Structure formats: structure tokens, C-alpha cells
Amino acid sequence: MAKITQTMMAQVLSLVGGSGNVAKCGNCMTRLRLTLNNSALADHAALKKISGVMGVVESDAQLQIILGPGKAQTAADMMNALIESGDNVAPAVSEADLSTIAAQQKKQMKSKQTSAVQRFLSKFATIFTPLIPGFIAAGLLLGIATLLEQIYVVGQTPSEFMLDLVAYLKVFGKGLFAFLSILIGYNAQQAFGGSGVNGAILASLFVLGYDPEATKGIYSGMSEFFGFAIDPRGNIIGVLLAAILGAQVERKVREYMPDDLDMILTSVVTLLIMGAVTFLIIMPIGGELFKGMSWLFLNLNDNPLGAAILAGLFLISVVFGIHQGFVPVYFALMEAQGFNSLFPILAMAGAGQVGASLALYARAKKETTIRTQIKGAIIPGILGIGEPLIYGVTLPRVKPFVTACIGGAAGGFFIGLISYLGLPVGLNTVFGPSGVVAIPLMTSADGIFAGMAVFVGGLLISYTVGFAATYFFGCKDVDLS
């Protein structure tokens, strides 16, 4: 795969309209995310031809350039450096461009509702992506600790060293989840246009304790809010609601606040308003929403058909860049079950891609371009990074993308069926890698080995069905050159 270079980023910047057309540059695990002032200036066809670019996705004013794992952060750093240097400015808009821009605006108006949803959900990438490496690290360490515990502690006479090692490996996950709400509150309020620290403070209201007799946690110093009982329910849903609404309140307060008093009073007024709203409205409503979301997805996950639908449609959400919208559901399931039972179901979608791509490889002749593409993308796909296969192999050919979704649905059906029969499995953390890398992170009510076995079974079924469906039904009239 091509290396991210300064020259490559300068080329990308030129093709999106120059530095003057980039309002914001960020990234997720695999994508460079550019918020453009005028999306009509971006040359999608030319961007896709750049060596190292695996695909381009547009979500309203945000252009997402797929670069692959380990490269998006480097690309974002280089891009921001180029923008700050001011070496590349946006080209002037000529009269010839006006018809193109008008057509683009018409297209945006027609898809206003869809774009608004996409725009909202895409912000979840900004909230949760910086936390994903921590989720993965804590999950892997917890998986290793649980494995050691099963082998050397349960039913054994463990050494002091082994007990200390297990406790040490688990402590990072406990630390992450103890204060995770504060991190999410910070990122959420910042993502929606407010000050991150205000979001963190509002999120801390859900972490503090309100029972003076409690022996655990940090007592807030108050047990009621002006006569109203305080029940810090809602968990991540409540935190997100408080931070998102808090950002809107902060922006509105700032509109009316004199510049000289902005730094001193804007946050004060915002916190006073949002503290009351959080205690009186958001905590009760967030609690009910949290329970409802948990109930819905627990029932979907325990239903083979529901699990198949979720797994089969997940790749479509990846294509539109809105798959981060599932993250709040992950939190709800962690709270309800102690593990994330939705994640292994959705992970089957990537396995279906692997099976479909292997079928295309088998059908294609030697020394063809598609074989070269698959060779470069299949290992990341097996390891859980599916975007190279999606944008480089299956999606451009359409039929294999559909049969890959069928393969994912088959694996999802299997995991849902096992759950329906009484053995739900899930990830031991909120978010983690998919593919074979996720195997040691799997757990269940019957222990980690049962969880790992069910997950591997689902992967094998998705590989097999994705391969068979593509080999027999997904290759006709498809470019295999």
C-alpha cells in the first residue's frame, strides 16, 4: 500500500479546492474527514485515482477519503500542517463553475433530511474515534487477564504473582469505564460546537454520588435538587443529551454575551442552565431511553432474524459513514449485559466481505488487476479492516457487495440463533477490533471459551456463505479483469 507523503496530501488538498475550501480536517481509524465550504469543488474521480486512496465517500459537506488503518492520523496531521502554512489557497470560482455549484446545491436541498441525519450521526465519529484505541487496549488486556484467570486461577491455587498480574491487567479497563462518561461528555460538547470542558463537567454529574450514606464513589455534597430527587440514570445516553444540548445553549448564550465577558460568564450561565435541565429532565428521560434502547437491541440480538438483518445491513451503514451511530447502543448493552452482544453480530459483515472477495479471486484469471487488489486487501479484511475490500473490490462491482451482505447476514443469523437458544456472546469492551483479532475479546455467560467458539463459528459461516453466494451468483456480468 502507498505511503502517506507530503506530496500526496498536497495533491489531495488541491483536488478538494485548496486550503481555503477546507473548513475542518479530522480523521477516524481509516478515513481522512474533510468538512468543505463548497463540496462542488472536490474532484471525486481524480481523488480516487491517487495511489493510496481506497475510496471517497461524501456525507453532505463532509468528504471522507478512505486511506486504511494506521494512515488516517498521519494524513490528517500533514493536511492540517499544509492548511496552516497557507501554501495552497482555494481557486476562485469562475462563471463556468456556477452551473455545477447550482446543481450541487439542488442535490443537497433534495436530500436535506437524509443529509441532516448523516451529518448528525457522522459527529459520533468525532466523539468516539479518539477513544477507540483505549477501548481496544483495555479490551485486549481484559481478555488476556480473563484467559489467565480461567487457566491459572479458577479451581487452582494461584501464586501471588499471578493474582497481582491479573489484577494489574484488569485495572486499566476499570479506570476507563469509571471515568468514560467524562471523556465522552468532553468530546460530545466539542463536536457539536461547544466547549469540551463544559461537556466534561456536565458528564461528571452522572458520575458523582447523591447518597450521603453510600460507601462507594464520590459524594457530590447534595442529595436533592431544590426538593427534587436526583437519580443519575441514563448513563451514556444522558451524557450525550446533556452535552449536545449544552453545546446549543452555550452557543446561544455566546451570541448575546458581550465579548469582554465571554470568557468569564458564558460557561457560568451555560452550566447553571444545563445543570438544572440535566437534574430535572435529562436524567429521567435519559434513563427511560437507555432502558428502551437496551430492551430493543437485546431482543433483536436474541432473535435470529433480527440479528441477520443487523449483520446484513451493517455494510451499508459503513458505506455511508454512519456506522458510528451504533456506539451508544454498545454502551447500553454493556450496562445491561456486562458485554457488547451487538458487536459480534455486526462483525459478521466484514467476514462476509472476506468470503466474497476470495470467491472473486477464485473466479478471476491469473495476473489480473482484481487479484492484485484482493491480495493487498484480504489480510486487513481478515484482521477486521474491511474498507479496502469494500471500496476497492466489492462495492464498485455491486453484485459481490450484495452477496457479501448475504454472507454477513448468515453469520449474524447463527450468532442470533445461539443467543436465542440461551448463550448470548459479546465483546468484553464497548468497542474493539473485528475479524480474527476480536476472538480473544469475546466472552459469554458461560465464560470466554464458549464466547470465542461461537464467534469463530459465526466467522466461518460468514466466510463460507459469502464465498458460495458470490461464486455462484455474484460473478455474472461482473468485471473480473
From Swiss-Prot:
<dbReference type="InterPro" id="IPR036878">
    <property type="entry name" value="Glu_permease_IIB"/>
</dbReference>
<dbReference type="Pfam" id="PF02378">
    <property type="entry name" value="PTS_EIIC"/>
</dbReference>
<protein>
    <recommendedName>
        <fullName>PTS system N-acetylmuramic acid-specific EIIBC component</fullName>
        <ecNumber>2.7.1.192</ecNumber>
    </recommendedName>
</protein>
<dbReference type="InterPro" id="IPR001996">
    <property type="entry name" value="PTS_IIB_1"/>
</dbReference>
<keyword id="KW-0762">Sugar transport</keyword>
<keyword id="KW-0997">Cell inner membrane</keyword>
<comment type="function">
    <text>The phosphoenolpyruvate-dependent sugar phosphotransferase system (sugar PTS), a major carbohydrate active transport system, catalyzes the phosphorylation of incoming sugar substrates concomitantly with their translocation across the cell membrane. This system is involved in N-acetylmuramic acid (MurNAc) transport, yielding cytoplasmic MurNAc-6-P. Is also able to take up anhydro-N-acetylmuramic acid (anhMurNAc), but cannot phosphorylate the carbon 6, probably because of the 1,6-anhydro ring.</text>
</comment>
<dbReference type="InterPro" id="IPR003352">
    <property type="entry name" value="PTS_EIIC"/>
</dbReference>
<feature type="transmembrane region" description="Helical">
    <location>
        <begin position="342"/>
        <end position="362"/>
    </location>
</feature>
<dbReference type="InterPro" id="IPR013013">
    <property type="entry name" value="PTS_EIIC_1"/>
</dbReference>
<feature type="domain" description="PTS EIIC type-1">
    <location>
        <begin position="122"/>
        <end position="481"/>
    </location>
</feature>
<dbReference type="Pfam" id="PF00367">
    <property type="entry name" value="PTS_EIIB"/>
</dbReference>
<keyword id="KW-0472">Membrane</keyword>
<feature type="transmembrane region" description="Helical">
    <location>
        <begin position="448"/>
        <end position="468"/>
    </location>
</feature>
<dbReference type="GO" id="GO:0008982">
    <property type="term" value="F:protein-N(PI)-phosphohistidine-sugar phosphotransferase activity"/>
</dbReference>
<feature type="transmembrane region" description="Helical">
    <location>
        <begin position="406"/>
        <end position="426"/>
    </location>
</feature>
<keyword id="KW-0812">Transmembrane</keyword>
<keyword id="KW-1003">Cell membrane</keyword>
<feature type="active site" description="Phosphocysteine intermediate; for EIIB activity">
    <location>
        <position position="28"/>
    </location>
</feature>
<keyword id="KW-0813">Transport</keyword>
<dbReference type="InterPro" id="IPR050558">
    <property type="entry name" value="PTS_Sugar-Specific_Components"/>
</dbReference>
<feature type="transmembrane region" description="Helical">
    <location>
        <begin position="307"/>
        <end position="327"/>
    </location>
</feature>
<keyword id="KW-0808">Transferase</keyword>
<feature type="transmembrane region" description="Helical">
    <location>
        <begin position="165"/>
        <end position="185"/>
    </location>
</feature>
<feature type="transmembrane region" description="Helical">
    <location>
        <begin position="190"/>
        <end position="210"/>
    </location>
</feature>
<dbReference type="GO" id="GO:0005886">
    <property type="term" value="C:plasma membrane"/>
</dbReference>
<feature type="transmembrane region" description="Helical">
    <location>
        <begin position="376"/>
        <end position="396"/>
    </location>
</feature>
<feature type="domain" description="PTS EIIB type-1">
    <location>
        <begin position="1"/>
        <end position="89"/>
    </location>
</feature>
<keyword id="KW-0418">Kinase</keyword>
<dbReference type="GO" id="GO:0009401">
    <property type="term" value="P:phosphoenolpyruvate-dependent sugar phosphotransferase system"/>
</dbReference>
<dbReference type="InterPro" id="IPR018113">
    <property type="entry name" value="PTrfase_EIIB_Cys"/>
</dbReference>
<keyword id="KW-0598">Phosphotransferase system</keyword>
<feature type="transmembrane region" description="Helical">
    <location>
        <begin position="124"/>
        <end position="144"/>
    </location>
</feature>
<dbReference type="GO" id="GO:0016301">
    <property type="term" value="F:kinase activity"/>
</dbReference>
<keyword id="KW-1133">Transmembrane helix</keyword>
<dbReference type="GO" id="GO:0090588">
    <property type="term" value="F:protein-phosphocysteine-N-acetylmuramate phosphotransferase system transporter activity"/>
</dbReference>
<feature type="transmembrane region" description="Helical">
    <location>
        <begin position="263"/>
        <end position="283"/>
    </location>
</feature>
<feature type="transmembrane region" description="Helical">
    <location>
        <begin position="225"/>
        <end position="245"/>
    </location>
</feature>
